């Protein structure tokens, strides 16, 4: 019964886990991070906001529409992640937009841990699923190795 109870949540975890493993390889999942050579980080936060407001897909009116800024000085960029899941990559020296793309990896991560369905699903469905799968795996390993170990002990 354990396998039957966890089959759907486990399938979701497997599929989304595979997608998350590929997020750096497949640009459809997560936009590739651009790199630029820079001498100085010369743009200000106010510049980042005004540049981001010019990207219509991101629907940014003010700071409240921005989920986070991911500053990468070693790559010379800042990633602006809008609350509507659009990502804007901006050159930190010249302030030019290097890339805009929809970021699906966040939704896939929420599906993977169950929080997309409901905040409680993470702890009340997906955590027990993981525990049941661990128990099933341990019992499967036990059933696999016990006959092998029994044969070895009979031979000696």
State where each predicted segment sits.
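Conserved histidines in hydrophobic membrane contexts and catalytic metal-binding motifs
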Residues: 1-156
């Amino acid at each position: 019964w354990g396998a039957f109870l966890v089959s759907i949540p486990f399938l979701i975890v497997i599929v989304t886990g595979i997608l998350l493993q590929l997020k750096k390889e497949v640009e459809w999942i997560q936009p590739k991070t651009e790199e630029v050579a820079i001498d100085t980080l010369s743009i200000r936060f106010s510049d980042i906001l005004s540049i981001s407001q010019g990207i219509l897909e991101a629907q940014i009116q003010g700071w409240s529409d921005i989920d986070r800024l991911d500053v990468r000085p070693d790559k010379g960029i800042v990633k602006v992640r809008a609350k509507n899941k659009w990502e804007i990559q901006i050159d930190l020296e010249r302030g030019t937009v290097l890339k805009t793309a929809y970021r699906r990896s966040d939704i896939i991560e929420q599906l993977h841990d169950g929080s997309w369905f409901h905040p409680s699903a993470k702890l009340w469905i997906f955590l027990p699923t993981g525990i049941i799968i661990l128990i099933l795996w341990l019992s499967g390993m036990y059933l696999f190795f016990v006959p092998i170990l029994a044969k070895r002990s009979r031979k000696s």
